[in-house]
Every structure is written in C-alpha cells, then in structure tokens.
C-alpha cells in the first residue's frame, strides 16, 4: 500500500476544488487576494483555504488519523477583480464542524487568525462571510432588537436622535450630567458617553453614572418621553465591565454601551447576555474598526465586523454616515446597513454583498449615523437611513450658538419636519434645505 509520504506539496492539490458544490451548512468566505508576483491564483486561494482550516506547511503523519476531506476548507471559485492588476476574489467553503457554537471569537480566530500574514500573499481582505442558519442559530444575537426597543421606548415612525457629550474628556461628572440633561430636555432621545470615556481621574465611572441617572429622570419627568444615555461599561477586565453594567441597571438606566472591537467579542457577548436577561439595551461603538477595514486590499471589510456584531449581540451599532466627516460610500454602506437590520438580504455585488444572507429571525440592529453630521444633513440622513436608525449629532448639537438645549431642539424640529415632508411625498433630496428653512422659522 501507499505509505506516508513526507515533504512539502502544493496546497492546490488538496485545497483547490472548483468542482465542489457548497453545502447549506458551510460557512462561506469571500477573500480579496493579492498574490505575490509569480504565485498562481489557484495556489494562493488554496493556501488561504488551507491555512484557515486544517492545513499546515508540510504533510504531517497525523493527517492520517483524521478525515481531511470532512474537515478541510476548500477554495471552490476564483475570479479576477475587474480593473485591478493581479487581484482576485477567492471563495472558500468551511465545514460547520470547524467552529465552536456561539463563539464569534472562535469564528474569527479560524477564518482570519493566521492566514493574513501569509508569505505567498501580498495582501488579503475578508470581504464577506455567509453565515448559515445552522450556525447563526447557535447565537442569541442582539439583546432586544429594533422592534422590542421601539416598544420599550414607545417611539415609532421616525429615526431616533442622539448626541455624544463633548468635550469628550475633561468634564467633571456634575457638568457632564448637566450637558446630558440639557440635550434630553431639548428633545433628543439619547445622549452618549464618548467611546474613550471609561473611568479616568477627572471623572470616575460611578460619579458619572449617578449624575447621568439624575439627568435622565429629571428630563423624563419634564418631557413625558422615555430618555436614555449610553453609559459606557467598557473596562479593563470583564469583571469590571459587568460591575458597571449591573450598577447601571440598579440605577434604572435603560441602556449601556460597549466598545466591541477594543473590548473584544468575548466580553461583548457576555455583556449582551447580561443585557438580554436584565432588560438593558446595548449600544455598540466600533472604535478601532478603521485599523481593520480602512485599506481596500488588506484587512476585513466592515460588513464582516457588522455581521460578527449582530451574532455577538448589540442593539445599536455605529455604521458610518455617508455624508459626515468620515469615509463611507453610499451603496456599500446601505448594503451593510441592510445586513444589520433585515431578515433576508439578497446577494448584490454592486452593494458589496457577496452572498445571500438569511438571518432567519435573529433580531436586527439599529445602524447609528454619527460623526460630523449636523442639522443641514437631516434631509439626506432621513432619506438614506429611513426610520430604523439612530442619528447622532455631537458637535451638531452642542455647537449651537445658543447652547445645548436649543441645539437639541433644532435637531428634533428638523427631524420631525423631514419625516413629515417625506410622509407628505415631498422630495427630500431636492427640497431638503427649504424644508429645514421653513421649519426653523
């Protein structure tokens, strides 16, 4: 019989399988590959499949103790990218058994853990993942989701309004609470801790939580509306994070916040479970995302990070603005906004959606538009994001020449005017400025 043959052999002999028919239970990945000069695309694609599943650089004796055909990742298709020299989209199918149930952490460790430093590749970007229902059903997903949140807040038929409290660092807890009160009293639904506000010497978390709670209840009593402030529970350890979330719940706060990329998926999923069990909404900030998703040819596209978050759990997530101070292309942004909100998203390459994604009945996430937007953007934002979104104006509220509360009033008036104009069938794109001008009289 054929004995064990030591040595190094081409990956493509084992891991490039163009005849493979993908299974409904496979996790599928689309990678944008830039091979090193002289490396054939098939070999590069196979190397990606191998290194992110069962392969290693040499044939090993222990391969004989398992069934590689059952467990290996397979590169089943490669297509050149139009308009790019030496760039390909490689499609890889992973058997479900390679992944631990309910662990976004393990999913990313497997798929993007090692292979991005691979010598045969000049660059690699994970463009999209297809998460099969067989896997997504092992996740609880968002603690509450869009519909439940609307019912808890009793707010329907319009986007929600938020505001990040600025200056983000340096305010005392008392002054911070005052700014929160003014914004909520003026008509916002939410105010927000900045992502870098954790527990610093000038404002410890406990003091902030107490003064913010006071602001919440005061503004709630005066306006007759449910109000919230995203209390940032992000901390240096999971235990400390949980302590902060528990304290927020004890104060009667409706929502807490987490920086899910710097905090990590494991911490995030623990927090999401706690929020679900205890009726807290969970606002997610994506600090550090651009480190991973900014380069077109290397890293992970934000739509992949967004899918990971929907599985791990969050009720809101920052998703770019299309119009503000930070990058974002409209169609592509709307693509991952739909991946966050909808049940079923059809494959559409023009929107960056490489696979049809069926979330079955996993709750949706509110996309949050935040960063450099102000009241004149309101018509565009209402049109682009629709009702199921949170629009956040930090400087666009607190920068109002008359102060915080008038800034909040301006945003609420503009939003209500845009929603009404849209419902009356007016064209927001064309008449936007005029609608805002009328409303401000």
Swiss-Prot record:
Matches recorded under InterPro entries: RuBisCO, RuBisCo_large_chain_AS, RuBisCO_lsu_C, RuBisCO_lsu_C_sf, RuBisCO_lsu_fd_N, RuBisCO_lsu_N_sf, RuBisCO_lsuI
Record's subcellular location: Plastid, Chloroplast
Cofactor stoichiometry and binding remark: Binds 1 Mg(2+) ion per subunit.
Single GO molecular function: ribulose-bisphosphate carboxylase activity
Superkingdom of origin: Eukaryota
Cofactors named for this entry: Mg(2+)
Gene3D superfamilies according to UniProt: Ribulose bisphosphate carboxylase, large subunit, C-terminal domain, RuBisCO large subunit, N-terminal domain
Catalysed reactions listed for this entry: 2 (2R)-3-phosphoglycerate + 2 H(+) = D-ribulose 1,5-bisphosphate + CO2 + H2O; D-ribulose 1,5-bisphosphate + O2 = 2-phosphoglycolate + (2R)-3-phosphoglycerate + 2 H(+)
SUPFAM superfamilies: RuBisCo, C-terminal domain, RuBisCO, large subunit, small (N-terminal) domain
One GO process term, biological-process aspect: reductive pentose-phosphate cycle
UniProt PTM: The disulfide bond which can form in the large chain dimeric partners within the hexadecamer appears to be associated with oxidative stress and protein turnover.
PROSITE patterns linked to this entry: RUBISCO_LARGE (PS00157)
GO cellular component: chloroplast
Enzyme Commission code(s) on record: 4.1.1.39
Keywords: Calvin cycle, Carbon dioxide fixation, Chloroplast, Disulfide bond, Lyase, Magnesium, Metal-binding, Methylation, Monooxygenase, Oxidoreductase, Photorespiration, Photosynthesis, Plastid
Record-linked NCBIfam families: PRK04208.1 (NF003252)
Family: Belongs to the RuBisCO large chain family. Type I subfamily.
Subunit-level organization: Heterohexadecamer of 8 large chains and 8 small chains; disulfide-linked. The disulfide link is formed within the large subunit homodimers.
Protein name: Ribulose bisphosphate carboxylase large chain
Gene name per UniProt: rbcL
């Amino acid at each position: 019989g054929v004995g064990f043959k030591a040595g190094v052999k081409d990956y493509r002999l084992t891991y490039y399988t163009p005849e493979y028919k993908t299974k409904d239970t496979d996790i599928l990945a689309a990678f944008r590959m830039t091979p090193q000069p002289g490396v054939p695309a098939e070999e590069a694609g196979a190397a990606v499949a191998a290194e992110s599943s069962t392969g290693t650089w040499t044939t090993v004796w222990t391969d004989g103790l398992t069934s590689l055909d059952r467990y290996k990742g397979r590169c089943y298709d490669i297509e050149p990218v139009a308009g790019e020299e030496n760039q390909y989209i490689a499609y890889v199918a992973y058997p479900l058994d390679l992944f631990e149930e309910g662990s976004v952490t393990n999913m990313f460790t497997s798929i993007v853990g090692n292979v991005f430093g691979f010598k045969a590749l000049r660059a690699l970007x994970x463009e999209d993942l297809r998460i099969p229902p067989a896997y997504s059903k092992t996740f609880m997903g968002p603690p509450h989701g869009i519909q439940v949140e609307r019912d808890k807040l009793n707010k329907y038929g319009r986007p929600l309004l938020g505001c990040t409290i600025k200056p983000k660092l340096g305010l005392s807890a008392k002054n911070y609470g005052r700014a929160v009160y003014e914004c909520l009293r003026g008509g916002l639904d939410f105010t927000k801790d900045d992502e870098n506000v954790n527990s610093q010497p000038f404002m410890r978390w406990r003091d902030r939580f107490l003064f913010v709670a006071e602001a919440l209840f005061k503004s709630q009593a005066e306006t007759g509306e449910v109000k919230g402030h995203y209390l940032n529970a992000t901390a240096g350890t999971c235990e400390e994070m949980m302590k902060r979330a528990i304290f927020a719940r004890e104060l009667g706060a409706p929502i807490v916040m987490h920086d899910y990329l710097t905090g990590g998926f494991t911490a995030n999923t623990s927090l999401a479970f706690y929020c679900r069990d205890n009726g807290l909404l969970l606002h997610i900030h994506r600090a550090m995302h651009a480190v991973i998703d900014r380069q077109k040819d290397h890293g992970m596209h934000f739509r992949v990070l967004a899918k990971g978050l929907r599985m791990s759990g969050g009720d809101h997530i920052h998703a770019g603005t299309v119009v503000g101070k930070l990058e974002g292309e409209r169609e592509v942004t709307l693509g991952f906004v739909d991946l966050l909100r909808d049940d079923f998203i059809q494959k559409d390459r023009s929107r960056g959606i490489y696979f049809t994604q069926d979330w079955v009945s996993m709750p949706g996430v509110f996309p949050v538009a935040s960063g450099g937007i102000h009241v004149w953007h309101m018509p565009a934002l209402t049109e682009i994001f629709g009702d199921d979104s949170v629009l956040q104006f930090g400087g666009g509220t607190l920068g109002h020449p008359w102060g915080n509360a008038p800034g909040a009033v301006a945003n609420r008036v503009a939003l209500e005017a845009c929603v009404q104009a849209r419902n009356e069938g007016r064209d927001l794109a064309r008449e936007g400025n005029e609608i805002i001008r009328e409303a401000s009289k």
